[in-house]
Swiss-Prot record:
Function: Mitochondrial membrane ATP synthase (F(1)F(0) ATP synthase or Complex V) produces ATP from ADP in the presence of a proton gradient across the membrane which is generated by electron transport complexes of the respiratory chain. F-type ATPases consist of two structural domains, F(1) - containing the extramembraneous catalytic core and F(0) - containing the membrane proton channel, linked together by a central stalk and a peripheral stalk. During catalysis, ATP synthesis in the catalytic domain of F(1) is coupled via a rotary mechanism of the central stalk subunits to proton translocation.
InterPro entries in alphabetical order: ATP8_mammal, ATP8_metazoa
Annotated protein name in UniProt: ATP synthase protein 8
GO molecular function: proton transmembrane transporter activity
Keywords: Acetylation, ATP synthesis, CF(0), Hydrogen ion transport, Ion transport, Membrane, Mitochondrion, Transmembrane, Transmembrane helix, Transport
Gene that this polypeptide is encoded by: MT-ATP8
Native organism: Sciurus vulgaris
Subunit organization: F-type ATPases have 2 components, CF(1) - the catalytic core - and CF(0) - the membrane proton channel. Component of an ATP synthase complex composed of ATP5PB, ATP5MC1, ATP5F1E, ATP5PD, ATP5ME, ATP5PF, ATP5MF, MT-ATP6, MT-ATP8, ATP5F1A, ATP5F1B, ATP5F1D, ATP5F1C, ATP5PO, ATP5MG, ATP5MK and ATP5MJ. Interacts with PRICKLE3.
Length: 67
């Protein structure tokens, strides 16, 4: 069984890490960030649903046992 030649693994791994580093640096450098992000006023919205104004069984108190 032939021996696995691992002599080129070091330079391959180092060059791969360097290439990935350069790729991510160029992606981050081209990304535009907002210089001063401002807070957007969020007003709470109220939804009018038909079951809010109705008296349904789920809103009734626990009923007493029948006598």
């Amino acid at each position: 069984m032939p021996q696995l030649d691992t002599s080129t693994w070091f330079i391959t791994i180092i060059s791969m890490i360097l290439a990935l580093f350069m790729l991510f640096q160029s992606k981050i450098a081209n990304h535009s960030y907002y210089s001063n992000p401002s807070h957007k006023d969020m007003k709470p919205t109220t939804h009018s649903t038909p079951w809010e104004k109705k008296w349904t069984k789920i809103y009734l108190p626990l009923s007493l046992p029948l006598h």
